[in-house]
Amino acid sequence: MTANDKKQLMVAACKVRMNVIKGVHAAKAGHPGGSLSAADMFTYLFCKEMKVDPKNPKWEERDRFVLSKGHTAPGLYGVLAHQGFFPEEDLLTLRQIGSHLQGHPNMNMTPGVDMSTGSLGQGISTAVGMALAAKYQGKENRVYTLLGDGEIQEGQVWEAMMAASHYKLDNLCVIIDNNGLQIDGKVADVMSPYPIPEKLQAFGFEVAEIDGHDFEQIEAAFNKARETKGKPFGIIMKTTKGKCVSFMENNAGWHGKAPNDDEYAQAISELQAQLAEVEGM
């Protein structure tokens, strides 16, 4: 990765985070914490990794993305708007009646959304089905799915993992956002899924553990995923819930709460300062 590539990704991630804050503030509802923790991954996927076309969202040869942790839709919408799938001003209609941007992704309403999700544990199952279908059809499409570490407390996740390994889905990349927090507190206290890497390996996955805010590590993991044959690939990314907004970081209270006007102003100010710093690099 060149220095300029890294800079452009960092700039994009700052803008995606601002989009998240703008959307949930306008809606007065939503899930900023997990959207911000995954913002760097959203950015890398849609700006560099995936084969997609904003002008033709239903392009048959595109790669597929399934947001299994569907409540973090503001993060997905933030990057889709940034990439031109729809106008950024649409973000201000989040969760409104008649808007194509609802609280959870809807594949029939939002350009760039490949699967309607929200019921935790089900997204990965549909991603496995997409990857298996691509294999049967002899297509080169890759399938990516993003889960939360709290989400993997759901039993259905592990049935899907078992199927992915059984069918040798090396076109599937399962990404787990390990920010350590869920709505009720620490994931380890609610129902510990740890250690995650060993569990994925036991289910037949090749695994990479990375810093989910380091673009070089993200790129290295995806390069390894493309080189892996005969088995699915899992990326466990260590992240910070509420990343880049000081009062939201590592605070489970921001799992599903919108900022008020003062908090919004502070969050945007912090992100604008970070953007200016990155652009000046």
What residue ranges belong to the model's regions?
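Glycine-rich beta-alpha junction loops
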Residues: 71-72, 76, 179-180, 214, ...
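N-terminal hydrophobic or amphipathic helices/low-complexity stretches enriched
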Residues: 1-16
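Glycine/aspartate-rich loop-and-adjacent alpha/beta segment that forms the canonical ThDP
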Residues: 205, 215-281
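N-terminal capping segment at the start of a domain
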Residues: 12-29, 177-179
